[in-house]
Amino acid sequence: MSDTPTAEDIAQHYSAAMDSVNLINALMAQDSRTTEEQDTVSRNVEHLQIMVAKDYWTTEDLTPLNNAITAGS
């Protein structure tokens, strides 16, 4: 069995990463965040850092992921 993700798998990974991007952006747009919200940002930044490091990306635009990592860090 191959560990290489299919195009569908990659699309699902990208969609999940974009969910993290949208959540980080929404929380960082607030004037302040609760401890729980900041923890959520941190977990999602970690998720994006892991995802950006994957070597299976092809034509996907990783700019929003990198921007959210920067915004949430």
What residues fall within each predicted segment?
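Terminal, compositionally biased segments
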Residues: 1-12, 63-73
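Short, charge-rich amphipathic interface segments used for partner binding and complex assembly
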Residues: 26, 35-73
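N-terminal acidic leader/helix
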Residues: 2-35
